[in-house]
Amino acid sequence: MSMTPREIVHELNRHIIGQDDAKRAVAIALRNRWRRMQLPAELRAEVTPKNILMIGPTGVGKTEIARRLAKLANAPFLKVEATKFTEVGYVGRDVESIIRDLADAAMKMLREQEIIRVRHRAEDAAEDRILDALLPQARVTSFSEEAAQTSSDSNTRQLFRKRLREGQLDDKEIEIEVADAVGVEIAAPPGMEEMTNQLQSLFANMGKGKRKARKLKVKEALKMVRDEEASRLVNDDDLKAKALEAVEQHGIVFIDEIDKVAKRGNVGGADVSREGVQRDLLPLIEGCTVNTKLGMVKTDHILFIASGAFHLSKPSDLVPELQGRLPIRVELKALTPEDFERILQEPHASLTEQYRELLKTEGLNIEFKADGIKRLAEIAYQVNEKTENIGARRLHTLLERLLEEVSFSAGDLASAHDEAPIQIDAAYVNGHLGELAQNEDLSRYIL
């Protein structure tokens, strides 16, 4: 990650409105990963990441920050829900599976990068194999045995290669030998994913090297052979070593819904298991060693970002040891009508742009006017205040309701309006949503 904190925040601003404190915190944490790697090895081992706790109501951008961060980081990244895990001894997934999943994500990411790197060599090798399958047929039907021995053989191959690249042979059927994939589906109860993965790897290795002849169209065969050649060019042992280092030095884990495993007051019963999940998370965040497919992974330098709405509980309800392991606290603010207005217009691929482009595919143009967007933002804010506050997610519900009739009759409306756009102004919004927004009982169930 060679981007500066300012550049990271600028990139996040393209997709997320407001929440500057949270953006700055994750930008600094991400940049510190790069800074640490520039230190001498001895000092580098001592510098541990400062984990982050993001606190804020639902729908204000916590999860969206995680999603965008994953694309920016170019590092092994995993987002998990804290509620999916149970204390060791209970039925369900244990928290160590987080690191196993992170290791799988690292392996997948590096394999994809490596396949892109060797793509050109794989394409050349795949073309040669397809031409080997094609040319015997061409020789029999088009050339005499004497001509096959001359230099015209090379010319023919080049001619066929040109036709292959231009797609002229895509529909021709050929018989070619490809790897025989052994796929075994194993159903196992929750919490036994590691055993399932090991069994699947075992069966996959048993079938490795087996090949069978298949009749395929050239287009399908080329794709299959290209993937096969790319996999052959990738060295799995090197990849595992790189993935192990990437997880340990650059891994990022985003734990959502951390508030749902916080103990609320002095409630007993099921909350015992919740506290158990927190205690199981402690060694993971503090630094321990977890057995994965890649080998033993040390979690000392993995960055953990936790987030929660904390509606029914407080950050102080987390066990004290876990609070201490999340030293950076960031509070995300509830959204205002002005924020809703900006969310509808400013982000890259904003909601209004998405609907506009979707309907354009049917030849129907819609235009969101400034007063219409303002009224929509006001209604979203009012409904959130009167009912449950679900933040920016309310806009999805409102826009679906607002454009339901237009979406249903898009084809007919496109013919009727020719190229004139449908104007979505304040009057249009009030006509479709005004009554629902005013009626609290209706808005509770419909909006």
UniProtKB/Swiss-Prot annotation:
Keywords: ATP-binding, Chaperone, Cytoplasm, Nucleotide-binding, Stress response. ATP binds at I17, G59, V60, G61, K62, T63, E64, D256, E321, R393. InterPro entries: AAA+_ATPase, ATP-dep_Clp_protease_ClpX, ATPase_AAA_core, Clp_ATPase_C, HslU, P-loop_NTPase. One of its GO terms (biological process) is protein unfolding. Coiled coil: none annotated. It comes from the Bacteria. PANTHER family: ATP-DEPENDENT CLP PROTEASE ATP-BINDING SUBUNIT CLPX-LIKE, MITOCHONDRIAL-RELATED, ATP-DEPENDENT PROTEASE ATPASE SUBUNIT HSLU. Gene3D superfamilies: 1.10.8.60, DNA helicase RuvA subunit, C-terminal domain, P-loop containing nucleotide triphosphate hydrolases. ATPase subunit of a proteasome-like degradation complex; this subunit has chaperone activity. The binding of ATP and its subsequent hydrolysis by HslU are essential for unfolding of protein substrates subsequently hydrolyzed by HslV. HslU recognizes the N-terminal part of its protein substrates and unfolds these before they are guided to HslV for hydrolysis. One of its GO terms (molecular function) is ATP binding. NCBIfam families: hslU, PRK05201.1. The keyword Nucleotide-binding applies. This is ATP-dependent protease ATPase subunit HslU.
